[in-house]
């Protein structure tokens, strides 16, 4: 089944929820904006499905893992995206392995993102996510 989500300005956040299946939170904005944080806390209390993103595109590198784990504990999203490395399959796989050792008990479903620059790198990263990483979902 295809699900729809849209990032939305806070002023129309609740209206947008009437058109979407889940909400997509950027972790760095949870720290920066109390209104943003409150909106997602309310969404979770209402039973909305929420994905917590590590803000890699916005920050150009993934949010710091320890702080990210703390936000997962605090927010309790449905899903979270493990910190990855843009277009870097080896670093992404290493970060996933490290995450799995240090944060195996965080409360939510885990999404692993496939990264790489070449077909072979992307294929290797996908295989790692599928066979080794113990993720609940793979994102490409």
Which sequence ranges carry the predicted segments?
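Non-catalytic, usually N-terminal nucleic-acid engagement modules in DNA/RNA processing proteins
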Residues: 1-95, 99-104
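Glycine/Thr-rich beta-alpha phosphate-binding loop at enzyme active sites
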Residues: 84-86, 91, 108-140
């Amino acid at each position: 089944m295809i699900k729809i989500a849209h990032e939305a300005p806070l002023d129309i956040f609740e209206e947008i929820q009437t058109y979407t299946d889940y909400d997509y939170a950027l972790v760095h904005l949870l720290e920066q904006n109390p209104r943003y944080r409150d909106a997602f806390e309310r969404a979770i209390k209402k039973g909305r499905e929420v994905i917590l993103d590590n803000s890699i595109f916005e920050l150009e590198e993934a949010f710091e893992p320890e702080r990210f784990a703390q936000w997962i504990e605090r927010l309790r999203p449905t899903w979270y995206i493990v910190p990855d490395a843009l277009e870097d399959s080896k670093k992404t796989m290493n970060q996933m392995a490290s995450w799995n050792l240090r944060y195996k008990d965080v409360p939510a479903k885990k999404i692993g993102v496939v990264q790489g620059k070449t077909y072979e790198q992307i294929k290797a990263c996908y295989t790692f996510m599928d066979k080794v990483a113990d993720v609940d979902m793979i994102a490409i």
